[in-house]
């Protein structure tokens, strides 16, 4: 994505895209971050910059996974969608980075089916989390304390339920990175009742 003209922070977000990603989840969060002045890069884990969503919409990623250092980003974001979540889960660099961040206490956000990746890696053990209702059993099996809230924050792990909670997830990431005042401003800008 282009760098926001109102760049408000040095914080950066890596938005990971595999074929079959959920476009509302990925792009609504990207939009909220842009409005808040946070640079977010759409990063393809496929062998091409064109990535196709779970509903057949083609998106051009900013960067290829092979060309970035994920550890240089402030926050790693895993959108859901099927089979996109499976594509992210099958990407060794994603697994490695999620585990590194968990060990270092660095932020990871995941929505819909993607929290199941965190659960399978053991990152949600004893942590409060949420996911799409179809994946609640998977995160519970991974030791998560499951909630039905739209967004759940447990220290540096941020999880959300699905496409309908994407704006709220984006705002929670903004809160994590920039604070509540910016959240209120962005929420007003997207006419989100709070």
Describe the function of each predicted region.
Residues 133-136:
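Short, acidic/turn-prone active-site loops that include or flank metal/cofactor-
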Residues 129:
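Anionic-ligand binding patches
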Residues 1-108, 116-120, 125-126, 138-148, ...:
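Extended, subdomain-level signal for the structured scaffold at the beginning of enzyme domains
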Residues 153:
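Cytochrome P450 catalytic-domain "roof"
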Residues 112:
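Catalytic, metal-anchored helix/loop core of enzyme active sites in primary metabolism
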């Amino acid at each position: 994505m282009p760098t926001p003209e109102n760049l408000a922070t040095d914080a950066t977000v890596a938005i990971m895209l595999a074929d079959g990603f959920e476009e509302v989840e990925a792009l609504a969060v990207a939009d909220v971050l842009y409005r808040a002045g946070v640079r977010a890069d759409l990063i393809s884990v496929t062998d091409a910059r064109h990535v196709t969503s779970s509903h057949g919409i083609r998106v051009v990623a900013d960067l290829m996974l092979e060309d970035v250092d994920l550890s240089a980003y402030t926050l790693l974001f895993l959108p859901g969608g099927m089979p996109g979540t499976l594509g992210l889960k099958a990407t060794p660099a994603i697994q490695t980075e999620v585990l590194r961040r968990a060990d270092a206490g660095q932020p990871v956000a995941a929505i819909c089916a993607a929290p199941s990746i965190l659960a399978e890696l053991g990152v949600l053990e004893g942590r409060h989390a949420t996911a799409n209702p179809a994946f609640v059993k998977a995160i519970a099996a991974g030791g998560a304390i499951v909630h039905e809230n739209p967004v759940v924050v447990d220290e540096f792990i941020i999880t959300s339920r699905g496409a309908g909670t994407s704006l709220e997830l984006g705002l929670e990431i903004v809160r994590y990175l920039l604070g509540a005042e910016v959240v209120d401003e962005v929420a007003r800008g997207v006419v989100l009742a709070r």
